[in-house]
Amino acid sequence: MDSSLKQKWVRALRSGKYEQATGALRNEDGFCCLGVLCDVYDPDKWVEPIPPLDEDEDDDGKWNYADQGDNYLYDTTDVLPVHITRIAGLTAQNPEVPYGIDGEMKSLASINDNGATFAEIADLIETHL
């Protein structure tokens, strides 16, 4: 992983600036650990959720993150966009690290969504990415 971006990401996760959320890179509650990486890289690329046209439609409140051409795709609300993955020097849009007593490989989003704190995730990133 790009060492400069990694350092900024880890520092941001430990900063207390970000509220932790689950289920999306960013939503009305805050950020997933992967969303923090997007925000560290370029905080101006977030695209606010569009309210549903039909009141029966579910408004999940997920923000999209624009690509390099200021386009956005709905499939980039839960994992890193491809261009952020490449820029960061990661091999996957949802990187895996050894986690738990048995050291089983788990995705960062899964670790985030299952209750690990940003500080704990920062330690994992620092050690394994």
Please report, for each region that a protein language model flagged, where it lies by residue:
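Domain-length accessory/inserted modules outside core catalytic folds
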Residues: 1-31, 38-129
